[in-house]
Amino acid sequence: MLNCDMLIDSKELKSTISKLKNEDNYTILLDVTAVDYLKFPDVTPSRFAVIYILRDSTFTKEITIKSYVDDNTLEIDSLYDLYESADWAERETFDQYGIKFVGHPNLKRVLNHHQFIGHPLRKDYKITKGQICTETEDLMDEMVPKLKSKGYKKEEIDDLMLLNVGPSHPASHGTIRNFVAMEGETITACVTEIGYLHRGFEKACEHHTYSQIIPYTDRLNYCSAILNNIGYSKAVEEMLGIEITPRAKMIRVIIGELSRILDHLVCNAANMVDLGGLTNFWYLFSPRDMAYDLLSKLTGARLTNTYTRIGGLEFDLYDGFDKDLEEVLKAVEKGVEDALSLIAHNRIYHDRTQDVGVIKADFALRNGISGPNLRAAGVACDLRKDKPYYGYENFDFDVVIGSHGDVYDRMMCRFEEMRQSTKIIRQAMKNLPDGAINVYAPGVILPSKKDVYGNIEGLMNQFKLTFEGIQVPKGEYYSFSEAANGELGFFIVSDGSGRPYKVKCRPPCFYSLAAYSKIVEGTMLADAVVTMASMNFIAGEFDR
């Protein structure tokens, strides 16, 4: 969608969105962000606007809403009582822009540390201004109110054991700190702190050309980097009104689904280790290593591939790719079968995963959870089916869903999704068309070396694209794709230049992790560990 669908006065925002939710079934809040128009070429009613992105209950329609904020107060009503997913989303917007959400129960920083001064995504904040954190926050300002809301008195709180799980703990699967209060082995309250891997992705995007941002997207979910490349490139291409070639679409499907398999292999393999099943880990990591060899041969890198280009791809498939790919797919299928054979009738595995870390469907939707974590709760939401792109509507594959939303269902959904991805890849290879991998668009695609050295037009085009970047039409746009962990979205604002005015990434992990503390409260600490592993939090993605 180019430009926002609705412009709402801030005084009417809450009532209007409440109506959209209750009458028009826009029951999912996908994301919240803000735009600082301080240096925008057009005149705007005020400096800051807050952006809300909603999706309806059929998963087929989304709407982008803008509301300008009073420059004197910088206040706007919180939507937390309408959507639980507004919690961390509004905290992030406050953290990055200084917008105050009136009525939010815990409006404090979430990505930047507690000693940080200022708001880094404001246009008058210099990107070179670093700020060091010198002491750890004890998080008692969140823990004590949470315990009191559960009926604990001060003297009872003093008797609880307070424990930090992370940020540097093997079970945290990344730089996540969970501060828990415990009675025996049971978690009574949990406070999650993130930001340890925050690199300022969105601030960096504002200082680079559209093409230079692609390597940064690799570092979001580094377990399936190419899916990030695809999601970002797709967003910019849609802003440009470009449709990539049929061959490029099919190759993106092939490599994207292979990346999905890699992500699921890592998730389930790591979960097996937490459960004590090291043999299963090697069964799943062996085909992963084969796939990395294939990607290295294709893209020149094993992990951070930077494979897509705006308008196409960096390289075409090499000779013999089809044979190498089939070997990888067979290895994946064997690894999955071998791992499953060890746990299918394993009593210990069933006891550790069934009815553990349960996520109900309505809870998942209220909290903005998507992807396998949502499907495991019984909700058949997959953007490849609901909002198909790149010809996904022409592929024969099933949307895998669970029935209980527990650790067992989440793992089994990922195992079966790997099978479905191999099915998609084989269909795509069978129907792979010939032709170019990049569109013919001199203002988008770099010219060949022959043209650069052979004629002045090619030389000038190469110079302008390299130094000035692709000139994207002025506008505001939200694009999405079905990444390995759920809906990966990019909200981009263009001022018509070769650098984006704003880029906001909607990381699926961010919303799953925001809900994690509510899921594990009342469970055993050991169960909280396997719950975390089964939800597949990637620090590079939620911290950005």
UniProtKB/Swiss-Prot annotation:
<dbReference type="InterPro" id="IPR037232">
    <property type="entry name" value="NADH_quin_OxRdtase_su_C/D-like"/>
</dbReference>
<keyword id="KW-0997">Cell inner membrane</keyword>
<comment type="subunit">
    <text>NDH-1 is composed of 13 different subunits. Subunits NuoB, CD, E, F, and G constitute the peripheral sector of the complex.</text>
</comment>
<keyword id="KW-0874">Quinone</keyword>
<dbReference type="GO" id="GO:0051287">
    <property type="term" value="F:NAD binding"/>
</dbReference>
<dbReference type="GO" id="GO:0050136">
    <property type="term" value="F:NADH:ubiquinone reductase (non-electrogenic) activity"/>
</dbReference>
<dbReference type="InterPro" id="IPR022885">
    <property type="entry name" value="NDH1_su_D/H"/>
</dbReference>
<comment type="similarity">
    <text>In the N-terminal section; belongs to the complex I 30 kDa subunit family.</text>
</comment>
<keyword id="KW-0472">Membrane</keyword>
<dbReference type="InterPro" id="IPR001135">
    <property type="entry name" value="NADH_Q_OxRdtase_suD"/>
</dbReference>
<dbReference type="GO" id="GO:0008137">
    <property type="term" value="F:NADH dehydrogenase (ubiquinone) activity"/>
</dbReference>
<comment type="similarity">
    <text>In the C-terminal section; belongs to the complex I 49 kDa subunit family.</text>
</comment>
<feature type="region of interest" description="NADH dehydrogenase I subunit C">
    <location>
        <begin position="1"/>
        <end position="138"/>
    </location>
</feature>
<keyword id="KW-1003">Cell membrane</keyword>
<keyword id="KW-0520">NAD</keyword>
<dbReference type="Pfam" id="PF00329">
    <property type="entry name" value="Complex1_30kDa"/>
</dbReference>
<dbReference type="Pfam" id="PF00346">
    <property type="entry name" value="Complex1_49kDa"/>
</dbReference>
<protein>
    <recommendedName>
        <fullName>NADH-quinone oxidoreductase subunit C/D</fullName>
        <ecNumber>7.1.1.-</ecNumber>
    </recommendedName>
</protein>
<comment type="function">
    <text>NDH-1 shuttles electrons from NADH, via FMN and iron-sulfur (Fe-S) centers, to quinones in the respiratory chain. The immediate electron acceptor for the enzyme in this species is believed to be ubiquinone. Couples the redox reaction to proton translocation (for every two electrons transferred, four hydrogen ions are translocated across the cytoplasmic membrane), and thus conserves the redox energy in a proton gradient.</text>
</comment>
<dbReference type="GO" id="GO:0030964">
    <property type="term" value="C:NADH dehydrogenase complex"/>
</dbReference>
<keyword id="KW-0813">Transport</keyword>
<feature type="region of interest" description="NADH dehydrogenase I subunit D">
    <location>
        <begin position="161"/>
        <end position="544"/>
    </location>
</feature>
<dbReference type="GO" id="GO:0005886">
    <property type="term" value="C:plasma membrane"/>
</dbReference>
<dbReference type="GO" id="GO:0048038">
    <property type="term" value="F:quinone binding"/>
</dbReference>
<keyword id="KW-0830">Ubiquinone</keyword>
<dbReference type="InterPro" id="IPR026662">
    <property type="entry name" value="NDH-1_subunit_CD"/>
</dbReference>
<keyword id="KW-1278">Translocase</keyword>
<keyword id="KW-0511">Multifunctional enzyme</keyword>
<dbReference type="InterPro" id="IPR001268">
    <property type="entry name" value="NADH_UbQ_OxRdtase_30kDa_su"/>
</dbReference>
<dbReference type="InterPro" id="IPR029014">
    <property type="entry name" value="NiFe-Hase_large"/>
</dbReference>
